[in-house]
Amino acid sequence: MFKTTLLFFITALCEIIGCFLPWLWLKRNGSIWLLLPAGVSLAFFVWLLTLHPAASGRVYAAYGGVYVCTALLWLRFIDGVKLSLYDWSGALIALCGMLIIVAGWGRA
């Protein structure tokens, strides 16, 4: 389960970076060259999703829980926004959902 969660976390970072760089280009007048590493990051994100042993729908559903937590970590450490009790509560619920889905992969 740790390996799966770590892989989800790395996958989420690739997705967030792949979306953040075009955002910088569009919203903060960043260089158009930001689109090149964004494309690479998103391609890597898609490839990482293929490494999971479950059906794609289950992978996407379980990945969503880790994505929520990773996005909130990004909010805190990259955007510099303090997390609220609601943020922490939502992340915990999402992570619990992910753990339930992953625990059932071999039983479905």
UniProtKB/Swiss-Prot annotation:
GO terms for cellular component: plasma membrane. It holds the Pfam family UPF0060. Keywords: Cell inner membrane, Cell membrane, Membrane, Transmembrane, Transmembrane helix. InterPro entries: UPF0060. The chain crosses the membrane at residues 6-26, 31-51, 61-81, 85-105. NCBIfam families: PRK02237.1. PANTHER family: UPF0060 MEMBRANE PROTEIN YNFA. This is UPF0060 membrane protein YnfA. It comes from Escherichia fergusonii (strain ATCC 35469 / DSM 13698 / CCUG 18766 / IAM 14443 / JCM 21226 / LMG 7866 / NBRC 102419 / NCTC 12128 / CDC 0568-73). The gene is ynfA.
